[in-house]
UniProtKB/Swiss-Prot annotation:
The modification Histidine amide is found at H40. Residues 1-25 form the signal peptide. Venom protein with unknown function. Does not induce paralysis when a high dose is administered by intrathoracic injection into the blowfly Lucilia caesar. It comes from the Eukaryota. It comes from Tetramorium bicarinatum (Tramp ant). GO terms for cellular component: extracellular region. Keywords: Amidation, Secreted, Signal. This is U15-myrmicitoxin-Tb1b. Its main location: secreted. It is found in: Secreted. Expressed by the venom gland.
């Protein structure tokens, strides 16, 4: 298992959690997820 894959899965789960919390649909492209990882990583 690659760390990048784990981070990507975690980012997707976190995005889903945020979507549920906000009560509105938030869709991120893989590029946006990568940008988020770069900012926070």
């Amino acid at each position: 298992m690659k760390i990048v894959k784990l981070i990507t899965i975690f980012a997707m789960i976190a995005t889903l959690m945020v979507t549920v919390t906000n009560g509105e649909a938030v869709f991120l492209t893989p590029d946006q997820i990568k940008a988020m990882i770069k900012r926070h990583g």
